[in-house]
Structures are given as C-alpha cells and as structure tokens.
C-alpha cells in the first residue's frame, strides 16, 4: 500500500524537494485500465504546487520528494494514497489505483 516509484530517466541525483518547496512538474494521470483522467502535458502548461503540506493527494506528497530534479518517473499510487473510497466524481471511480507519469521540472527557482 502507498506509492511506488519506477524511474524512467534519472534526474541530477542531488536536488530533492522538501516539504514546503514549490515544485513545477508535468504529469499524465491514468487509471489501471489505461483511461487518462488528467494531463498537464495535454494542457500545455506545467503544474505548479507546494509539496508535502497536504494540498495534494498523499501519493504525490510522499512520492514526488523521492524524485530528483529533472527525473522522469512513473508513480503507482494505491487508493488509500489517492482518492480512496470517494474517488473523484466523473473522473476517478472509488478505490482506484492511479498511475502518474511525472517529470520534475523545477524545485523553487532551480530548474532542471
């Protein structure tokens, strides 16, 4: 249970986000059946947020800090670290495992 990270391409191996850092990333989220439910790539605009302060699903708050600047990874997030029994009406069914392809583009003002 939780979040599992599979590295697609390595980052710099030195800079990792800490709670409270502002991160910039691209992501594509899919269900285990392959259905895409969200993508910053498709919108053409990276996602900017604060990591580790409870603004995001737990799987991101715990998975993204394991990535170094510039890294591309696949995060597999179990329902208890995602949207749980509520799901996200219209997009994510209850108790869904989520798959995210994530690229960490920046931590605060430091870019990959």
Curated annotation (Swiss-Prot):
What is the name of the gene encoding this protein? fkh1
Write down the PROSITE patterns for this protein, in alphabetical order.
FKBP_PPIASE
Any other comment in the entry? Binds to the immunosuppressant drug FK506.
MF term (GO), any = peptidyl-prolyl cis-trans isomerase activity
EC class: isomerase
Please identify the protein, giving its name as recorded.
Peptidyl-prolyl cis-trans isomerase
> Mind listing the GO biological process terms from this record?
conjugation with cellular fusion
Q: Which UniProt keywords apply?
A: Cytoplasm, Isomerase, Nucleus, Rotamase
E.C. number, please? 5.2.1.8
- Is the keyword Membrane in the record? no
Which family does the entry's similarity section mention? Belongs to the FKBP-type PPIase family. FKBP1 subfamily.
- InterPro entries assigned: FKBP-type_PPIase, PPIase_dom_sf, PPIase_FKBP_dom
Its UniProt entry gives the catalysed reaction(s) as: [protein]-peptidylproline (omega=180) = [protein]-peptidylproline (omega=0)
Q: Would I find Nucleus among this entry's keywords? A: yes
Question: What is the protein's known function?
Answer: PPIases accelerate the folding of proteins. It catalyzes the cis-trans isomerization of proline imidic peptide bonds in oligopeptides. Has an important role in sexual development and serves as the target for rapamycin action.
Compartment annotation: Cytoplasm; Nucleus
- A GO cellular component annotation in the UniProt record: cytoplasm
Q: Where is this region: Disordered?
A: 1-22
